[in-house]
């Protein structure tokens, strides 16, 4: 999947689902560079919800030359409708970012299900129904001059959506990171606020501790930050499948941003 705009978190949610389902990876690429292994026989999905149709066309042409079967989700697909041999869906105009992410996520689930990779439709329906029964905690306002948002690698879409929302709605720089890989060392490197960017606000989207190695590493990392006086906002995203936690995180992110603007 290729996406370079505000809907990238929807693509990353599909990647999280695919990893969990063990059907085979469905990676998300956030720029127009095409990996060398992408070629004949590969299904490629382009998500171009923004208005840069030239970029979508160039990427489409490059993938087609390589022999890929290209599926397109875009704001203007009319120029490609008579050329693509894959699915094509037009994103309605006038959607805000939350609506656009939801639309693209649902569309991607339909495309992935129709490919026969795994039942993404049912996974989305079940996850949405489960999260709808939650009693989510009201979060405090986000504080900081720049915000780093971290989640574990199984819910990458969660931290990316938070970072995108903060940049869009609050208007301050924000970045996302994945734990417990290299970003564990990065986060510990932020531990002393007197030395490393006192204006940095850190948000950790924490799944319910389950005794796994990632959970243990995240716990120790938070202890190090606390011992060194670095304030961290810990957001409980509960348990359940990666998609459930991704959706729950996105809802909590919307609430946190509203309290901060």
Please tell me what each predicted stretch does.
Residues 1-130, 140, 206-212, 219-228:
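Glycine-rich phosphate-binding loops that contact phosphosugars or nucleotide phosphates
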Residues 8, 12, 99, 103, ...:
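Conserved active-site and cofactor/substrate-binding residues in soluble primary-metabolism enzymes
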Residues 12-15, 106-113, 164, 168, ...:
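Short, hydrophobic/amphipathic alpha-helical patches that form generic packing surfaces
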Residues 26-33, 73-75, 172-184, 230-240:
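A generic structural motif
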Residues 78-86, 185-191, 242-243, 247:
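Glycine-rich, charge-decorated loop segments at or immediately adjacent to ligand/cofactor-binding or catalytic sites
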Residues 113-199:
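Active-site phosphate/pyrophosphate-binding segments
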Residues 197-261:
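C-terminal active-site/capping subdomain that shapes the small-molecule cofactor and substrate pocket
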